[in-house]
Amino acid sequence: MSKRKTKEPKVDVVTLGPSVREGEQVFGVVHIFASFNDTFIHVTDLSGRETLVRITGGMKVKADRDESSPYAAMLAAQDVAQRCKELGITAMHVKLRATGGNKTKTPGPGAQSALRALARSGMKIGRIEDVTPIPTDSTRRKGGRRGRRL
């Protein structure tokens, strides 16, 4: 009988450019997408091409109704901050996004708590930018001619 070949688990090694001097900040970009159904916290390198960490509120809580809650966003942000510290990222630029388009331009309930949790976990915050898509001339909004009747 021949020996069975087993695959060893593949370990990704992420390097963030050249070596960093003492006291120098290594920046990442954290994209926070806060809708009213979930909160996504997605960390990339400065170019935005390489995903380093991506955690959602739904990965942290069991009940579907709690996915967008501030508590779930806080847990997700703490996980993201811990993983970033392992990778050597010490500072972040924040890009905050709501649903936008012809839907609501207001960020969901998890946006503020995610940002606070990142700041409290020891991450330096560089710039905070709102990147909610704003329509210049949009498709027709949902609700019909007479709008949504309450």
Swiss-Prot record:
- Presence of the UniProt keyword Ribosomal protein in the record: yes
Record's InterPro entries? Ribosomal_uS11, Ribosomal_uS11_CS, Ribosomal_uS11_sf
- Transmembrane regions listed in the UniProt entry: none
Q: Which residues carry this modification: Phosphoserine?
A: 19
Asked if the record carries the keyword Ribosomal protein, the reply is: yes
Q: Which UniProt keywords apply?
A: Cytoplasm, Phosphoprotein, Ribonucleoprotein, Ribosomal protein
Supply the PANTHER family for this chain. Answer: 40S RIBOSOMAL PROTEIN S14/30S RIBOSOMAL PROTEIN S11
Query: What is the protein's given name?
Result: Small ribosomal subunit protein uS11z
- Origin species: Arabidopsis thaliana
What is the taxonomic lineage of the source species?
A: Eukaryota, Viridiplantae, Streptophyta, Embryophyta, Tracheophyta
